[in-house]
From Swiss-Prot:
<dbReference type="GO" id="GO:0019843">
    <property type="term" value="F:rRNA binding"/>
</dbReference>
<dbReference type="InterPro" id="IPR009000">
    <property type="entry name" value="Transl_B-barrel_sf"/>
</dbReference>
<comment type="function">
    <text>One of the primary rRNA binding proteins, it binds directly near the 3'-end of the 23S rRNA, where it nucleates assembly of the 50S subunit.</text>
</comment>
<keyword id="KW-0694">RNA-binding</keyword>
<keyword id="KW-0687">Ribonucleoprotein</keyword>
<dbReference type="GO" id="GO:0003735">
    <property type="term" value="F:structural constituent of ribosome"/>
</dbReference>
<dbReference type="Pfam" id="PF00297">
    <property type="entry name" value="Ribosomal_L3"/>
</dbReference>
<keyword id="KW-0699">rRNA-binding</keyword>
<dbReference type="InterPro" id="IPR000597">
    <property type="entry name" value="Ribosomal_uL3"/>
</dbReference>
<keyword id="KW-0689">Ribosomal protein</keyword>
<dbReference type="GO" id="GO:0006412">
    <property type="term" value="P:translation"/>
</dbReference>
<protein>
    <recommendedName>
        <fullName>Large ribosomal subunit protein uL3</fullName>
    </recommendedName>
</protein>
<dbReference type="InterPro" id="IPR019927">
    <property type="entry name" value="Ribosomal_uL3_bac/org-type"/>
</dbReference>
<dbReference type="GO" id="GO:0022625">
    <property type="term" value="C:cytosolic large ribosomal subunit"/>
</dbReference>
<comment type="subunit">
    <text>Part of the 50S ribosomal subunit. Forms a cluster with proteins L14 and L19.</text>
</comment>
<comment type="similarity">
    <text>Belongs to the universal ribosomal protein uL3 family.</text>
</comment>
Amino acid sequence: MPKGIIGKKIGMTRVFKDGKAIPVTVIQVEPNYVVNIRTEDKDGYSAVVLGTGEKKEKRTPKPMLAIFKKAGLKPLRHLAEFPLKEGEQPEPGQEVKVEDVFEKGDLVDVTGTSKGRGFASAMKRWDFSGFKKSHGSRYHRAVGSIGACSDPGRVWKTKRMAGHYGNETITVQGLEVVDIIPEKNIILVKGSVPGAPKSVVKLKESVIIHRRKGKRKLERAKAVYAS
């Protein structure tokens, strides 16, 4: 089975456990289908390509249309590639459900596109403190100095200034799976994830479980949901 799955962010709510309120993000996992399999012999690595969401056939490129037809699937809108777990390998055209990939207490990394905020000031974009609000200050929300005078005589690249903010791919690591509702294809993840409601997100096995702190966090989470 793959180490990840494609879902859709619904919104945030909270659940109660032992009298404590836990903020969670509700993610709906629509039917995911295996589109293609990457193999060591052909591609040099092992992975699986999952797809979800309907797409019109006339809007699908012919090379992709051939891949879908080979797997016995209709064109799918969203595709993502995930590494494979050890054990049973999926077949092209097979449906992958959320309970096949994750269980309570797992740690996941969630990738999504952050909300676009348009042209934003340096204070909003980079969390600058700004100038004094009173006592004769000539500036309040200005950037301030953006470089030296004659040397180098220009503004350095990557200088933090006003500009386009948001609409970026962001990954939040080490979020805990609080609950899975198979009959509704819903997974509850502790904390917030990037993106607006109804935006597509990718959930995959967290990379921090291979670190010392991540292993301890995973052990604590598993112990909580085992009790």
